[in-house]
UniProtKB/Swiss-Prot annotation:
Gene name, Swiss-Prot/TrEMBL: rplX
Annotated PANTHER family: MITOCHONDRIAL RIBOSOMAL PROTEIN L24
Domain of life: Bacteria
Protein name: Large ribosomal subunit protein uL24
Gene Ontology CC terms: ribonucleoprotein complex; ribosome
Organism the protein comes from: Nitrosomonas eutropha (strain DSM 101675 / C91 / Nm57)
Length: 107
């Protein structure tokens, strides 16, 4: 499988939408192009009570997925969004790096 530029657990910044400029981490991938980011794109959802499953009804806030093109990986050294490239390290493994300064993301 091809290596992805953004992975689960990466520190990202939101590029567009109502949460533009927020920094957070990727929680999970919903599909190939949709990502759930912690505390971003939160919406209120109405939940019906279900006593057999011990679910209390009411209004809850959940995180909805956003498109992967609306986020960018965050470079903490430069304190801004950055692009990701791929290269092979000395042992022959493929690793990600920041294109602006060449520092490795995967150590």
């Amino acid at each position: 499988m091809a290596m992805k530029k953004i992975r689960k657990g990466d520190n990202v910044i939101i590029l567009s939408g109502k949460d533009k400029g927020k920094q957070s981490t990727v929680i999970k991938f919903e599909s190939v192009e949709k990502v759930i980011v912690r505390d971003v794109n939160r919406v209120k959802s109405h939940v019906k009570p279900n006593p057999s499953k011990n679910i209390v009804g009411g209004i809850v806030e959940i995180e909805k997925p956003i498109h992967v093109s609306n986020i960018a990986i965050f470079n903490s050294d430069k304190n801004k969004a950055d692009r990701v490239g791929f290269r092979f390290n000395e042992s022959g493994n493929k690793v990600r790096y920041f294109k602006s300064d060449g520092t490795l993301i995967d150590l």
